[in-house]
Amino acid sequence: MHSSALLCCLVVLTGVRASPGQGTQSENSCTRFPGNLPHMLRDLRDAFSRVKTFFQMKDQLDNILLKESLLEDFKGYLGCQALSEMIQFYLEEVMPQAENHDPDIKEHVNSLGENLKTLRLRLRRCHRFLPCENKSKAVEQVKNAFSKLQEKGVYKAMSEFDIFINYIEAYMTMKIQN
């Protein structure tokens, strides 16, 4: 895991270096970002498809963790913060627990996490997509509900990851159109 963190740092440092006579690679990649977004979302969906059945079969709860209020936050003035917090929530709380539920899915969950980290890195590099500081109440509600579900929360959160991808897509589509 440490080597992947080092690799991410190298990618960031390489992307920030200015090219003679041109904008930075970061600026250039930001102009291409809207065109690359569908590919990044497809990669997330493909990675999720490898673990979707496992987690949805284990999710025995009837309630929904990722409610419509979260999508509304994604579409509202808190969209940036809600997206940032949800990415952090999945990377730091959900996926580390999900990796430990079955050795057969660990690699696939890790791959899904790496795809999500790549998206976060590109969003941060292109400040117009993720320039935020405020807290989202909907994200807090998701985190509280997740905590209350205890071990079952991992199954619930992972089984709804496709909803999260759809919310990311709705947020990014809105930002690109503005």
Curated annotation (Swiss-Prot):
Cysteine pairs forming cystine bridges in this chain are 30-126, 80-132
The record ties this protein, via InterPro entries, to: 4_helix_cytokine-like_core, IL-10, IL-10/19/20/24/26, IL-10_CS
Please provide the Gene Ontology terms (biological process) for this protein: immune response; negative regulation of B cell proliferation; negative regulation of cytokine production involved in immune response; negative regulation of inflammatory response; negative regulation of interleukin-6 production; negative regulation of membrane protein ectodomain proteolysis; positive regulation of B cell apoptotic process; positive regulation of cytokine production
Which GO terms label this protein's molecular function in UniProt? cytokine activity
On whether Transferase is a keyword of this UniProt record, the answer is: no
User: Where would you find this protein in the cell?
Assistant: Secreted
Does the keyword Transport belong to this entry?
no
Its domain of life reads Eukaryota
What are the record's GO terms for cellular component? extracellular space
Leader sequence segment: 1-18
Keyword line: Cytokine, Disulfide bond, Glycoprotein, Secreted, Signal
Residues the record marks as carrying a glycan: 134
Name the PROSITE patterns on file.
INTERLEUKIN_10
Query: Which family does the record claim for this protein?
Result: Belongs to the IL-10 family.
Q: How does it assemble?
A: Homodimer. Interacts with IL10RA and IL10RB.
Functionally, this protein is described as follows: Major immune regulatory cytokine that acts on many cells of the immune system where it has profound anti-inflammatory functions, limiting excessive tissue disruption caused by inflammation. Mechanistically, IL10 binds to its heterotetrameric receptor comprising IL10RA and IL10RB leading to JAK1 and STAT2-mediated phosphorylation of STAT3. In turn, STAT3 translocates to the nucleus where it drives expression of anti-inflammatory mediators.
Output this protein's name: Interleukin-10
